[in-house]
A protein has these predicted regions:
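Pre-Walker A adenine-sensing motif
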Residues: 3-20
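Hydrophobic anchor at the beta1->P-loop junction of P-loop NTPases
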Residues: 25-27
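Walker A/P-loop
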Residues: 34
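Short glycine-rich substrate-engagement loop in P-loop NTPases that contacts/grips substrate
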Residues: 54-86
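Conserved catalytic/switch belt of AAA+ P-loop NTPases
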Residues: 100-116, 120-121, 129-130
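Interdomain motor-coupling "hinge/lid" segment immediately C-terminal to the ATP-binding subdomain
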Residues: 119-121, 126-225, 229, 259
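Accessory nucleic acid-recognition modules appended to NTPase machines
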Residues: 180-299
Length: 299
């Protein structure tokens, strides 16, 4: 797959290179977290060819023996090289049981510069301070922006490129497929995996039908004012027996996993946030087209 230099993210990593922080790279599935680590590794090796980089990718079966924190901790220490700069890269760290114990232990030894990636539902911004004893530095990675899309395809005409970007979106893994139907199949699979693995697994969702209805509602009402109560009222009219607190929790879970972003209303005159009716946006707009179709495209 073709790679582009995602400089805005790479620069953030370079700026904290060598600091004692635990660097945490989060973002929606398939947004490029692993590729960013690859690019950062190449940068480090170009600057310090003699460094020692210990890299673990839990997406690969090669590391299935390291799925407990003790095994992970011992493995990293076994590959430590005295007298060199030692870096630890761990991809999809949440797949290791009690991973925070291993990371905290490695950090406490003060021997490693640590970088980890993970699914956002398992590495919440609000949880980082409680998971890790050391200071963390979070970098949030997003799907391709419009400018990155243009760079990837070498496009010059912004107007023509915008039409294509609206249809194809920023999930770069879909670019490998030849036709739009296949692209949307890929994007729908990414979203379904996000819902099933990241959200249902993390939060032990039992009412999966309700979760699906909330997802459909938010997708169909992107940029409209929404609240847990008005969604509850809408679904209640379909004879669903639900409570607005449950709906609100499910909406928060969707945001935790970067499926949606919540934008709060702001009172400019009063200079304060309003407490109700926020707007919700998808992390990539093509999730909507892949799941609901393109008949009502509104651009």
């Amino acid at each position: 797959m073709k790679l582009i230099e995602r400089r805005q993210y790479l620069d953030k990593l370079i700026n904290v290179l060598g600091t004692p922080d635990i660097k945490v790279i989060t973002g929606v599935r398939r947004s490029g977290k692993s590729k960013l680590l690859e690019a950062f590794r190449a940068y480090i090796e170009s600057e310090d060819p003699d460094c020692n980089i210990i890299q673990i990718n839990f997406n690969l079966p090669d590391y299935d023996d390291l799925l407990t924190y003790r095994a992970l901790y011992d493995y990293v220490n076994a590959y430590y090289v005295a007298g060199k700069e030692n870096f630890v890269f761990i991809d999809e760290v949440q797949m290791c049981k009690d991973f925070e114990k291993a990371v905290n232990g490695l950090h406490a030894s003060e021997k490693y510069d640590i970088y980890i990636t993970g699914s956002n539902a398992f590495l919440l911004s609000s949880d980082l301070a409680t998971l890790f004893t050391g200071r963390t530095f979070e970098i949030k990675v997003y799907p391709f922006s419009f400018s990155e899309y243009m760079e990837y395809f070498g496009l010059k005409d912004r107007y023509d490129a915008l039409d294509k970007y609206v249809l194809e979106g920023g999930m770069s893994g879909s670019y490998l497929y030849k036709n739009q139907e296949a692209k949307y199949d890929y994007i729908a699979d990414v979203f379904d995996t996000l819902i099933v693995r990241d959200i249902r697994k993390k939060y032990k969702i039992r009412n999966t039908q309700l979760m699906d209805r909330i997802v459909d509602f938010l997708m169909d009402n992107v940029s409209n004012l929404s609240s847990a109560r008005n969604i509850t009222n809408t679904l209640g009219s379909m004879q669903e027996k639900i409570h607005h607190t449950t709906v609100g929790n499910y909406m928060q879970y969707l945001c935790n996993a970067f499926a949606f972003y919540k934008v709060r209303r702001y009172d400019i005159k009063g200079k304060k946030y309003l407490s109700s009716n926020d707007k919700y946006y998808l992390s990539d707009h093509t999730f909507r087209y892949a799941k609901l179709g393109t008949k009502n495209m509104d651009y």
